[in-house]
């Protein structure tokens, strides 16, 4: 869409942060209003992350107004909230391309702009990176400032606290801004806190505090009295004791939608030494009532009509794999009170809403704490329960040592329901589920299953749930199932594949939900088609049978080729000295960028046409 200067006259003056800083302060509330309306107009036309950005408009304007970005370095955690940042940093006219193939990246991305200091997508990384950047800036000696913005969800992760503990030890000059949208501030309390924050962040107070420490350092009773007086004043309205104990100078909470008040507080804090912590209160979805009322639904949106206040409903077609999992979870829990389900802050995405309502005492959302989720599951298993960890492929990476050390070595029966496996689409490199088969396959005695449809997915979940000799995993993709009939649940024989079609010369060994595309190729080439089902243990007998009865083999998977299921097939053949040629089809050796699942599969040759072309070229 073209930018309408008449509709956004103040925003039209800002093509860069340098131009932003030329605006008089009095015009900034109007700029915030236009920026919020432009964000609504843009995202409703193109889709994207929405409610978080609406909540950070004033903060974004204030930070770029006070700090000399990009010389001063601004780091956004996760990046869902960074759309206003992109708009103000030279990407205003391209914001309608965000999350689209070839368009703006969905998160801050170093290769896209000098303003994007840290490429992000996963949570809770900002403070750790910020400390490193602040230490480097100190050694550089050019008075470059460092600011990290982290949300109330992301700050619950252990990594954030590890970083803050380190910052309190080495005391770099940096600012951490906590964007807290979990609660609202009443007018009176908010006004009092805003006034106190400006007082406590001011130079006079800071000078008195530091000077007093020096003057009375040799007089313990007076020093202790001053310390207690300060704590008493701050403790009346400031919930910052934890951050103070970690070594930060805590200021807040303040109204995150008062842009002029934020500017005053940020200017006061800009030149303070040591680690600083500013706690701001915002409302997710601010300025668009439907998003304010339901920020979870409006977190990420398809194209929609803003005047209606409603998102388009799904067509009521096939259920998603997440829903298949959620339905199976409820069905199984109703029969077995030992079932416990765990998610690291992905209740909606993992299809667990109904389960959480029906079985609240057996549902555990551990927040953004993947490591804890896995070891918590280990403890439940030790206690005689049957834990299921529902987690996205890309987030399970964050708990790899816990899978190894706390679950697998102890042979604990923990079932991993791995959602968003393979290509996920618009969220790009940081969210593709490209590596789970590779990083799980090397774990001794791990059972790994890859369903080809929703019925097989249910059977595999059932099989894994009843497997008691160690951990198991079922990986399934983002998106809808294929529409097969659901049959009664029964355990599958571990490590056994099935032949779906008999052909000649060529055998296609398929792992997972690319099966419909592989079936088209098998039909076209008159190839044998095998549903391998298990990545570990592999059906070695079936692989050797296919090698003996065919001239060539092709493996198909939506995982990195390196270390994936196809690599396992190669290992079996080499171990048995079988000289049959094998073509491995899967994800190539680079991070897969954004685009729809269909676009990326076509580009990577993972649709039927692409697979057939690869096979013909290889056989030629």
Swiss-Prot record:
Q: Any binding details for the cofactor?
A: Binds 1 Mg(2+) ion per subunit. Binds 1 thiamine pyrophosphate per subunit.
Q: What is its EC number?
A: 2.2.1.7
Some GO term, biological process aspect, for this entry: which one? Answer: isopentenyl diphosphate biosynthetic process, methylerythritol 4-phosphate pathway
- What Gene3D superfamilies does the record point to? 3.40.50.920, 3.40.50.970
Choose one Gene Ontology CC annotation of this protein and give it.
cytosol
Q: Which residues bind Mg(2+)?
A: 152, 181
Q: Which cofactor does it need?
A: Mg(2+); thiamine diphosphate
Pathway of action:
Metabolic intermediate biosynthesis; 1-deoxy-D-xylulose 5-phosphate biosynthesis; 1-deoxy-D-xylulose 5-phosphate from D-glyceraldehyde 3-phosphate and pyruvate: step 1/1
Q: Which domain of life is it from?
A: Bacteria
Give the GO molecular function terms. Answer: 1-deoxy-D-xylulose-5-phosphate synthase activity; magnesium ion binding; thiamine pyrophosphate binding
Catalytic reaction(s) noted: D-glyceraldehyde 3-phosphate + pyruvate + H(+) = 1-deoxy-D-xylulose 5-phosphate + CO2
SMART domains, per this entry? Answer: Transket_pyr (SM00861)
What the protein does comes down to: Catalyzes the acyloin condensation reaction between C atoms 2 and 3 of pyruvate and glyceraldehyde 3-phosphate to yield 1-deoxy-D-xylulose-5-phosphate (DXP).
Q: How does it assemble?
A: Homodimer.
This protein is called 1-deoxy-D-xylulose-5-phosphate synthase
């Amino acid at each position: 869409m073209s930018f309408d200067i008449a509709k956004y006259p103040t925003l039209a003056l800002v093509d860069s942060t340098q131009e932003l800083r030329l605006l008089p302060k009095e015009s900034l509330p109007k700029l915030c209003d236009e920026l919020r309306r432009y964000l609504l107009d843009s995202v409703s036309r193109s889709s994207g992350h929405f409610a978080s950005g609406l909540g950070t408009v004033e903060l974004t304007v204030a930070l770029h107004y006070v700090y000399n970005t990009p010389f001063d370095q601004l780091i956004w955690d996760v990046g869902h909230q960074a759309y206003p940042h992109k708009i103000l940093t030279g990407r205003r006219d391209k914001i309608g391309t965000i999350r689209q193939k070839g368009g703006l990246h969905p998160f801050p991305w170093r290769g896209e702009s000098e303003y994007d200091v840290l490429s992000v997508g996963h949570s809770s990384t900002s403070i750790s990176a910020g400390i490193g950047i602040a230490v480097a800036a100190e050694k550089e000696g050019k008075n470059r400032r460092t600011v990290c913005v982290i949300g109330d969800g992301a700050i619950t992760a252990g990594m954030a606290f590890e970083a803050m503990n380190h910052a309190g030890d080495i005391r770099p000059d940096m600012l951490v801004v906590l964007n807290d949208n979990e609660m609202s501030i009443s007018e009176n309390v908010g006004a009092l806190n805003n006034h106190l924050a400006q007082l406590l962040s001011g130079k006079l107070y800071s000078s008195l505090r530091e000077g007093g420490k020096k003057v009375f350092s040799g007089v313990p009773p007076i020093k202790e009295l001053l310390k207690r007086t300060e704590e008493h004043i701050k403790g009346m309205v400031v919930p910052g004791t934890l951050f103070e104990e970690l070594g930060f100078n805590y200021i807040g909470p303040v109204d995150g939608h008062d842009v002029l008040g934020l500017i005053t507080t940020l200017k006061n804090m800009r030149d303070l030494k040591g680690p600083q912590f500013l706690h701001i209160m915002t409302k997710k979805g601010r300025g668009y009532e439907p998003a304010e009322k339901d920020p979870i639904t409006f977190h990420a949106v398809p194209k929609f009509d803003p005047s209606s206040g409603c998102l388009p409903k799904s067509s009521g077609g096939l259920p998603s794999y997440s829903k298949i999992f959620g339905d199976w979870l409820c069905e199984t829990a109703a029969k077995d009170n030992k079932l416990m389900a765990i998610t690291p802050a992905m209740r909606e995405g993992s299809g667990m809403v109904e389960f959480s309502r029906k079985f609240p005492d057996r549902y555990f959302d551990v927040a953004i704490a993947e490591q804890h989720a896995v070891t918590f599951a280990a403890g439940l298993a030790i206690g005689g329960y049957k834990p299921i960890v529902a987690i996205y492929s890309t987030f399970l990476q964050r708990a790899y040592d816990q899978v190894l050390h706390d679950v697998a070595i102890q042979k604990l029966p923990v079932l991993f329901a791995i959602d968003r496996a393979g290509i996920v689409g618009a969220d790009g490199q940081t969210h593709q589920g490209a590596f789970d088969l590779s990083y799980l396959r090397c774990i001794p005695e791990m059972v790994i299953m890859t369903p080809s449809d929703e019925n097989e997915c249910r059977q595999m979940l059932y099989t894994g749930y009843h497997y008691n000799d160690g951990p198991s995993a079922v990986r399934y993709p983002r998106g809808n199932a294929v529409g097969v009939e659901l049959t009664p649940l029964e355990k599958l024989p571990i490590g056994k594949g099935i032949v779906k079609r008999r052909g000649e010369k060529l055998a296609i060994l398929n792992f997972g939900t690319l099966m419909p595309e592989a079936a088209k190729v098998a039909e076209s080439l008159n190839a044998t088609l095998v549903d391998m089902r298990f990545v570990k243990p592999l059906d070695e007998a079936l692989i050797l049978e296919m090698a003996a009865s065919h001239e060539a083999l092709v493996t198909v998977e939506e995982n990195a080729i390196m270390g994936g299921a196809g690599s396992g097939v190669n290992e079996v053949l080499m171990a048995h000295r079988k000289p049959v040629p094998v073509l491995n089809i899967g994800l190539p050796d680079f991070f897969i960028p954004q685009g729809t699942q269909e676009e990326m599969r076509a580009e990577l040759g993972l649709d039927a046409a692409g697979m057939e072309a690869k096979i013909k070229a290889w056989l030629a």
